UniProtKB/Swiss-Prot annotation:
It is found in: Cell membrane; Cell junction, Plasmodesma. This is PLASMODESMATA CALLOSE-BINDING PROTEIN 4. Residues 88-187 have a biased composition (Low complexity). Residues 1-19 form the signal peptide. It is a lipid-anchor; GPI-anchor. A lipid is attached at N197 (GPI-anchor amidated asparagine). The lineage of its organism: Eukaryota, Viridiplantae, Streptophyta, Embryophyta, Tracheophyta. PANTHER family: BETA-1,3 GLUCANASE, PLASMODESMATA CALLOSE-BINDING PROTEIN 4. Disulfide bonds join C22-C83. It holds the Pfam family X8. The gene is PDCB4. Its main location: membrane.
Length: 222
């Protein structure tokens, strides 16, 4: 008796470890519907087989039964639940092809997929360097005007050789009143050489000087 108990535990553990899934058998749909009702009422996640659930399709009693009894079995197997449902279900190591994405195996451990982040290569734009345009300065040629030098008009002086008749003083009269031709530097006034009263004035002065000299001589004699 003491030997049979450990053996039964080992067998049960071996059976559980290999029975990854709990699936409904092909048969009477009423029996399968009862299995669905029992599983959904005792902790199975039956929202998946609702019309808006992810496992609603294919919409068959067999598919919905597989999802319901498997969900119940995965949650309750650790506490002693079996995959029987009054003969409507049995354990299986492989999931059905119709609902494989909706069934989770008890002994299957999924390998997490680590996504490799995609590092985008930054695009560096090549800066465009414009070539500066250097304008050629225009140097204007200065225009030098030729100065016009005027030649002064030098008048030729008219030198008159007019010899007039001598006047009363014995001096010839000239047609020009200037001493130097072309100029006005000649003496002007009543005391010049052309004064007609010059002889009379000179005579009076001479007589005066003679008179004075005579008086001085008389005084010296006395």
């Amino acid at each position: 008796m003491s030997v049979l108990l450990p053996l039964c535990l080992i067998i049960s553990m071996f059976t559980y470890s290999n029975a990854a899934y709990c699936l409904c058998k092909e048969g009477n749909e009423q029996v399968l519907q009862k299995a669905i009702d029992y599983a959904c009422g005792n902790g199975a996640d039956c929202t998946q087989i609702q019309p808006t659930g992810a496992c609603y399709q294919p919409n068959t009693v067999k598919n919905h039964c597989d999802v319901a009894v498997n969900s119940y079995y995965q949650k309750k197997a650790s506490s002693g639940a079996t995959c029987d449902f009054n003969g409507a279900a049995s354990p299986s190591t492989t999931p059905p092809s119709t609902a494989s994405n909706c069934l989770t195996g008890s002994s299957s451990s999924g390998t997490p997929t680590t996504g490799t982040p995609t590092t985008g290569t930054p695009t560096s734009g090549t800066p465009t360097t414009g070539t500066p345009t250097t304008g050629t300065p225009t140097t204007g040629t200065p225009t030098s005007g030729t100065p016009t030098s005027g030649f002064p008009n030098t008048g030729t002086p008219n030198t008159g050789t007019n010899t007039g008749m001598p006047n009363s003083n014995g001096m010839p009269t000239s047609s020009s009143s200037s001493v130097f031709p072309g100029t006005t530097l000649g003496p002007t006034g009543s005391g010049g050489l052309g004064d007609p009263n010059a002889g009379e004035k000179l005579s009076v002065r001479t007589n005066t000087v003679v008179f004075l000299l005579t008086g001085v001589a008389a005084m010296l004699v006395i």
